[in-house]
Structures are given as C-alpha cells and as structure tokens.
C-alpha cells in the first residue's frame, strides 16, 4: 500500500461496514424462512404463509427504491457523509424489529426499513468512495462495496446455521455502532465540498485522503489534483449564475448517453439471473445428488460469491472494468446454458446420471463469474461515468431502475419458472447475459486508470460521432 492511499483505504473500509451489515440483512432470510414456514415457527399465528413470505422478500425492493430517491436527493443537499450516518437509523430499527418480531407484520416493516437503508448504501457508498479515491486505486476501492456485501451475506448464512434467528441481529447492531464511531470523524468528500464552493474545506479534506495533513509543502501531484477541482468548480460557477439543476442538465446528448448506459448496467446486474438463481440453491444441489442441507448449500454459495468479488478487487485495475464485465457476462451466460441443458434433458427423460456433476459445476460458474464482474462493477462504473453536477440524481435514478428490476424478479420469477420451468428461465438469463456483454463491448467506455475528467471527455467525444 502506497503511503498516499492509507486513509483512502481506511475510509473505504469504514464506509463498507454499512455494506457488510446490509449484506447480512439481505442474507438473513436464507435460514430464517425455513424456520418460519416449519411447524417450529416461533410466531403466535404459527407458520407463515407463502404470500407472507413473498411480501417479506419483495418489500425490501420497494424500501430500496424509496431509499434511493430520498437519499439521492439528500446527498445533493447535505453531502455524502451525513446521509450515510442518517442511513444507520432505519438499519438499526429494522434489526430491532427482527429481534422483537411476533408475526409477519413486524418482519415486513423490518424488511422495508432495511431496504430503505440499503437504497442509501448502494447510492452513497459508491459516490463517497469514488470521490475520495485516486485514479490508480479507484477501481479496487470501488469494488469493495460488493465484496463486503457478500461477506455480510456469508456471515448471515453461517450465523443462521449456528445461531437462533433473533440472536444474530445483535452482532450486526454492534457493527453498525462501530461504523458510527469510526465514520463520524472522517471528512466529507473533497469533490462535494468544492462543488458546494467550500474551497478551504475541500483542500483540507483532500489533504487528509492523500495523507498530506502534516506536510506544509505538498507535492506537485496534489497541487495538480487541487487545480483540477478548482477548474471544475470555477467552470461551473462562471458558466451559470445558479448552480441549481435544470432539465437541460439531463436533456443533452452526454447525459442521455450516461443514463442509458447506467440503466443497461443495472439491467445486466439483475437479469444476469444470479440473485434469482440463489433461491434455487437447494434444488440444484439436490438434483446433483448432494446430501448437504439447504443451509450448508447457502454457505458454499456465499463462499463462492465472496471469492469472486475478491478476484474483482485484484483484477479491476489490471484487466480493466470493460474486459472484466464482458468476460463475466459471457461466463455467467455459459453457466446458465450448461445448467439449462442439463435440466431440459432431465425433463425429456434422458439418462443424465453420468452428468450429475454438471449442475453444481454450472451453478458455481454462474455465481463465480457474476461475482467478479456483472454483480460488482456496475455501481462503481456508474459513478465514474456520470458528470459531477448530475451525479447524485443520475445515480439515484439508475438505482431506482435497479430496485424495480429486482422487485420484478423477486415477485414474479417463481411464476415464470412455474410456466417455463427452470431450464426456460435459464435460457432467458443466458440471452440477457450475452446481450449485456455485446452492449458493454459497443457502448461502455473503459475507465481504468483514467481521471473522472478524462472519462467524461471521452464520452463527449464518442457522443459527437
């Protein structure tokens, strides 16, 4: 680790404690739902119905959508830091409701509030990390969002297997408190401060994140970076008497191109089918002849996801974002096709006994390939390609589309799977993956090692062609 990146890495780790807690919140139902639908259900009314389970699962997406809208607006008004601290409140309340839950209503409210906090996390953490990072490590730090999210899910799978459903929340409440204590002392993003015309505070913040607080004469690299921020600030200030957003800021070729790319990346993130397929983990292990319990199967999937997202942090500044996305999408698509062919041949009555290894191998490929690219990189790339002035609202809007896509998948995937069967859904997911890879190849710019200014200049140049 170079000395200048010390506090950037520290701040990224602190911010992503929220990602870890939200990953645990998202993974918590994996083991809990099995208990809630069994004869040993701890609730007064007995086992939860399929409809109640459906709403407990899908209400998270509605909360996330509203959280995106609210915190996207708030991040333009109050910055990145304060809204991240405020996002702790709904997350804390959601875990407390789970501890106190007596029926499905408690859990529905808890999942809504947790989703609301998740909406904040998926917009604020990428914004914050992108704006404090040097170009050379921005990709590695940005990919930590999903790495910590997957770590949280794995912790939830493990704790759900060995602890009661209302005991593990105490662990995550403790982690949230640790986040509060550590993060409240970090400075605001220097880019947001400069955008808010607080030049002295912006320089102080940039000095902190470049580990230059105690150096009276900073190196030329720092001076150059500070001048770039000033130029951007002066250009915005002199270009208009009012820095408030207007429709023209969004209704121009560059903004429209960025928004289309953002929505496409969010669609690829969801319709690659990885999240939907996690619900079929136990089924896939069963048709492979595995005797593992559903909980142990989930833990194995969690480990594969974690390793895949860690690979992303290692390769993103070496191979580049674009290549990783394309290879990830193709790998995920091929995994879906091979698993779909196995399931289809089994439906036709073919003898597949000698190919029982295919489901687990294919499923592992889907999870692993998706975790190093299509699940990890879209959030970081969205913040990299978006102009500073419209960044908060554009990222918020694209994240809203993500939650809409997620809600559609969670709510209606079981219905479509019942009609088309599993193999039909897998072939659709494969088509989405290959289409997404082609879109990335043609339209998405490479951002590896480039400054945010040069990325936008490249997009403007491509838009004019």
Regions found by a protein language model. Name each.
Residues 1-207, 236-465:
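Alpha-helical transmembrane bundle of multi-pass membrane proteins
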């Amino acid at each position: 680790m170079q000395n200048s990146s010390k506090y950037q890495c520290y701040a990224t780790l602190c911010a992503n404690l929220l990602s870890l807690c939200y990953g645990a919140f998202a993974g918590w139902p994996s083991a809990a739902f099995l208990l809630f639908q069994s004869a040993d259900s701890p609730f007064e009314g007995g086992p939860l119905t399929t409809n109640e389970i459906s709403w407990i699962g899908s209400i998270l997406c509605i909360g996330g959508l509203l959280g995106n809208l609210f915190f996207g607006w708030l991040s333009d008004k109050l910055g990145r830091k304060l809204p991240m601290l405020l996002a702790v409140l709904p997350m804390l309340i959601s875990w407390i409701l789970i501890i106190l839950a007596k029926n499905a209503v408690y859990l529905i409210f808890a999942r809504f509030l947790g989703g609301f906090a998740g909406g904040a996390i998926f917009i604020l953490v990428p914004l914050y990390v992108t704006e404090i990072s040097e170009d050379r490590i921005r990709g590695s730090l940005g990919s930590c969002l999903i790495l910590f999210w997957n770590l949280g899910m794995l912790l939830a799978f493990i704790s759900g297997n060995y602890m009661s459903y209302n005991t593990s929340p105490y662990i995550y409440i403790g982690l949230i408190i640790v986040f509060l204590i550590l993060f409240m002392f970090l400075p605001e993003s220097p880019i947001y401060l400069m955008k808010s015309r607080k030049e002295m505070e912006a320089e102080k913040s940039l000095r902190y994140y470049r580990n230059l607080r105690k150096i009276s004469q900073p190196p030329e690299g720092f001076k150059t970076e500070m001048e770039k921020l000033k130029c951007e600030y002066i250009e915005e200030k002199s270009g208009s008497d009012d820095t408030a957003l207007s429709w023209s800021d969004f209704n121009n070729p560059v903004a429209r191109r960025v928004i289309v790319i953002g929505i496409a990346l969010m669609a690829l993130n969801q319709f690659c089918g990885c999240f939907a397929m996690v619900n079929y983990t136990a089924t896939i292990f069963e048709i492979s002849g595995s005797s593992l319990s559903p909980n142990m199967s989930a833990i194995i999937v969690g480990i594969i996801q974690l390793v895949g997202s860690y690979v992303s942090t290692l390769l993103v500044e070496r191979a580049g974002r674009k290549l990783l996305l394309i290879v990830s999408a193709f790998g995920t698509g091929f995994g879906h096709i091979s698993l779909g062919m196995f399931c289809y041949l089994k439906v036709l009555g073919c003898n597949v006994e000698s190919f029982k290894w295919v489901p687990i191998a294919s499923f592992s490929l889907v999870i692993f390939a998706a975790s190093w690219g299509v699940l990890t990189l879209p959030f970081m790339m969205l913040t990299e390609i978006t102009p500073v002035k419209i960044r908060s609202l554009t990222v918020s809007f694209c994240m809203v589309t993500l939650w809409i896509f997620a809600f559609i998948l969670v709510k209606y995937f079981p219905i479509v799977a019942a009609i088309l069967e599993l193999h039909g859904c897998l072939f659709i997911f494969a088509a989405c993956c290959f289409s997404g890879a082609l879109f990335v190849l043609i339209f998405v710019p490479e951002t590896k090692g480039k400054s945010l200014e040069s990325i936008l200049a490249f997009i403007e140049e491509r838009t004019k062609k």
